[in-house]
Amino acid sequence: EIAQCLVGSEMCIRDSYEKAAYMTALKLGNAVNVSESTVVRFAIELGYEGYPQLQRSLQSHIKNRLTSIQRMDVTRSRIGDLDPIEGVLTQDMDKIRHTLENVDREAFDNAVNTIVDARRVYIQGAMSSGILASFMHYYLRLIFDKVTLIGSVATSEIYQQMIHIGEGDVFIGLSFPRYAKSTINACKFAHDCGSQIIAITDSENSPLAQYAHTTLCAYSDMVSFVDSLVAPMSLLNALIVAVSNRNRCRVEQTFRKLETLWDNNDVYKKDV
């Protein structure tokens, strides 16, 4: 039966890898006419701790190659008839839990120290990761006046904005599958210029990690054609809070000034 599972799974993965990587053990077993327990034993025979580890390995290899149409097909097969609110929010909670359980605390502390001690901080993210980069830039700018957001996806313009980067600086690159070439190239450029590199990405196998001195991993996945960035955003929240805790006096002074400015310019509605 294991042999049958091996042959059947190989055919299933080869012929429809984008769906097979997201099948449950039960669905994969049904697809190759074996039991769910046989699929689990099959994963163990391949050297994995169980089927979930095999599944994550498959996903990490193929998710950067999935087109938007294939992503929509995968989501339909995973969520099925579930209410989108229940299905999507449950998956997002699992992503945060997985990130929390696997985050490298030493790497996290190194990232905090590097940002605090840096002469200048450059942040870059493209496509949907650009939202993460903007979010991080917004809050770090409230703590430091040394933070620059690299805002273009054109490689030549990125290099122009980074022309003065060098030793003593830190470059923070954010990218998740499908990885943006502009961010990979920017990481390499900053690395070659002698800057410290912090990669915020989905795994140590990410193309950003090869240039990084510190890699922070957050579990990322797709929901239909939408990139689920819930776990990366949560990790950024933690990183920003940790950095602000190291600069408590500076942050308090900044917000006292901001509160005065906001009051004087009637920024927020108060009679709510």
Predicted segment positions?
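Beta-strand-loop-alpha-helix segment that lines the small-molecule cofactor/substrate pocket
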Residues: 12
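Glycine-rich phosphate-binding loops that contact phosphosugars or nucleotide phosphates
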Residues: 116-234, 238-247
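A short, charged, Gly/Pro-tolerant segment at domain boundaries
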Residues: 249-272
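Short, flexible, glycine/charge-rich loop motifs used to bind or transfer phosphoryl groups or to couple energy/partner
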Residues: 1-2, 18, 110-112, 159-163, ...
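Single conserved hydrophobic/aromatic residue that forms the stacking wall/gate
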Residues: 1-9
